[in-house]
Amino acid sequence: MTVSQIPIAAIATAPGRGGIGVVRVSGPDVGAVMRAVCGRALQPRHATYLPFLDARGNVIDHGLALYFPAPNSYTGEEVLELQGHGGPVVMQMLLSRCLEAGKDIGLRVAEPGEFTRRAFLNDKLDLAQAEAVADLIEASTEAAARSAARSMEGEFSKAIHALVEKVIHLRMLVEATLDFPEEEIDFLEASNARGQLTRIREDLAGVLKQARQGSLLREGLSVVLAGQPNVGKSSLLNALAGSDLAIVTPIAGTTRDRVRETIQIDGIPLHIIDTAGLRDDAADEVERIGIERTWEAIRHADIVLHLIDAADYIEHGISETDDHIDDRLSGQLPPGSPIVRVINKIDLAPSVGAMGFGGNRPHVVAANGPNPTEIWISARTGAGIDLMRSELLRLIGWQSGNEGAFLARERHLIALRNAESHLELAEASASQHAQALDLFAEELRLAQDHLNSITGEFTSDDLLGTIFTRFCIGK
């Protein structure tokens, strides 16, 4: 038997107790399981309330049974779904009974994601839609769930297919010019091939922009709170989270280890990490280890908020220690990850200090040369917290109220960027016309391959295995 000819079964609902639990069976000849467990054949696509029977005819449970003939099912195969009471013992008994009834047809327990993988292999959905199924299940915000649902409905795939069709059309023109060089008609000039390529690149840029937004919804951002001891990092974490997660005292070095909390800003998950204060003279070994872990968190951060005491900053400007922290942050952060100075405790700061500027009101100072963006707040009173949220969204390029976004993964962004690079090379080769038509055609082909990898039309088995094994068992 091939994989598609072997029937599979699994508990499709989450582990634990619940009002309803579902056992799903998919594959050829599941009618044998249906008749054994349900006691009779079922009318296709109709829910039937009946007892589920063991091998001796004793009742395991009462529930709903649904039978979907191929190809009109989730997997494209015959599917039987048994909906009973959601206790773990009952569900395991029902699954065991299905496996027992299906032993003659080779029924086995499904691997993680195998139902959805079969749906993909049977053309019930493409790879981007299949990934969206898992993303919908794992969505951590309402906005992420809505975007995953749009991807599952095919919004992302439609955008990719539209790009691929345009690339194919342009490839046809280039191939025609290569195959019939003696023709008097210049296919590329007659069809404005360069204009077509420009429009394709513009369309791709639009899809990539939407995909970046979707990636923010799915992945969220890692935001590290860093700075010297006792500058209000834990207070800021509590203010952003809306609860007292971290211990706050006037004693420097209170936070010894990282404290992590996930919050939402406009639907984007922000993973806020409070860290040990940064100083050279750690009080003890525990604090030293905490500082090392701070720098480890910084090396994986998307944004670092460098907190600075407002009163000291107004009186003396950036201190030598904070300037050194900024320099080290620049060297430790991943490329493209911004540093934001958060000037905290403005409620305790004078209106005008020795440096000649005021700081007892919330405001933002835009980045200027080597100086990063500054946000002036009071974590204790909450002044400026909403301003900070808005500024963080601006810094990451988030478009508020972007209801049209679809969810995207890192591999999608990589594929889109690779396609973008090949289209750029295609445009460069097009300027050489006849001398580089072969190169022009090849770059278009490579761009098409990268786009097709998103929907699974050109995808390695290794990638498929990686994607589907991350699903839950019953999906």
UniProtKB/Swiss-Prot annotation:
It is found in: Cytoplasm. Keywords: Cytoplasm, GTP-binding, Hydrolase, Magnesium, Metal-binding, Nucleotide-binding, Potassium, tRNA processing. GTP binds at residues 230-235, 249-255, 274-277, 378-380. Mg(2+) binds at S234, T255. Its main location: cytoplasm. Binds 1 potassium ion per subunit. Its cofactor is K(+). Disulfide bonds: none annotated. K(+) binds at N230, T249, I251, T254. Its EC number is 3.6.-.-. GO terms for biological process: tRNA methylation; tRNA wobble uridine modification. One of its GO terms (cellular component) is cytosol. GO terms for molecular function: GTP binding; GTPase activity; metal ion binding. It holds the Pfam family MMR_HSR1. NCBIfam families: mnmE_trmE_thdF (TIGR00450), PRK05291.1-3 (NF003661), small_GTP (TIGR00231). Homodimer. Heterotetramer of two MnmE and two MnmG subunits. Exhibits a very high intrinsic GTPase hydrolysis rate. Involved in the addition of a carboxymethylaminomethyl (cmnm) group at the wobble position (U34) of certain tRNAs, forming tRNA-cmnm(5)s(2)U34. Belongs to the TRAFAC class TrmE-Era-EngA-EngB-Septin-like GTPase superfamily. TrmE GTPase family. This is tRNA modification GTPase MnmE. It comes from Cupriavidus metallidurans (strain ATCC 43123 / DSM 2839 / NBRC 102507 / CH34) (Ralstonia metallidurans). The gene is mnmE.
